């Protein structure tokens, strides 16, 4: 069930990236938790149009949109949502998670960078600093267009 939900979230993100345009845009990553404090779903929102476009959101609105999307897509039982990262900047973003031990709860992080590789490395470094060396994985990646976006995202 979780893999199905994550697949849908990734597909949704891919659609947003395909229709993306330049301009100052907000993005946010949201995680949903059940009554036991275990994460059950994660998604993100990134504006697909520049300021003034139909899908433009600033950082605050992107946070609200990510939470709404999470609640629509999440399975029943989500009792708490958390925005683990949000910004109004241009760049690549990587959402990752890992664990400190076999039965430990997942630790969620978001890395930002000028390339996919930089964003992923920043996310992995955050996991390492938090001691989450087990079951590390990059869950999804996206590119957030900002005011200084002069070129499409690199394919690194």
Regions found by a protein language model. Name each.
Residues 1-11:
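Bacterial N-terminal signal peptides that target proteins for export
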Residues 24-156:
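Secreted/extracellular ectodomain signature
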């Amino acid at each position: 069930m979780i893999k199905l939900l994550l697949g849908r979230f990734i597909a949704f993100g891919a659609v947003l990236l395909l229709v993306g345009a330049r301009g100052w845009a907000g993005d946010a990553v949201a995680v949903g938790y059940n009554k036991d404090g275990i994460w059950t779903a994660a998604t993100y929102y990134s504006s697909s149009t520049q300021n003034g476009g139909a899908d433009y959101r600033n950082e605050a609105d992107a946070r609200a949109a990510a939470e709404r999307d999470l609640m629509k897509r999440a399975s029943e039982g989500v009792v708490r949502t958390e925005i683990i990262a949000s910004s109004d900047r241009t760049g690549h973003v990587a959402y990752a998670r890992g664990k400190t031990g076999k039965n430990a709860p997942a630790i969620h992080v978001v890395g930002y960078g000028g390339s996919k590789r930089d964003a992923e490395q920043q996310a992995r470094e955050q996991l390492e600093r938090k001691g989450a060396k087990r079951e590390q994985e990059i869950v999804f990646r996206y590119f957030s267009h900002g005011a200084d976006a002069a070129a499409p995202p690199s394919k690194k």
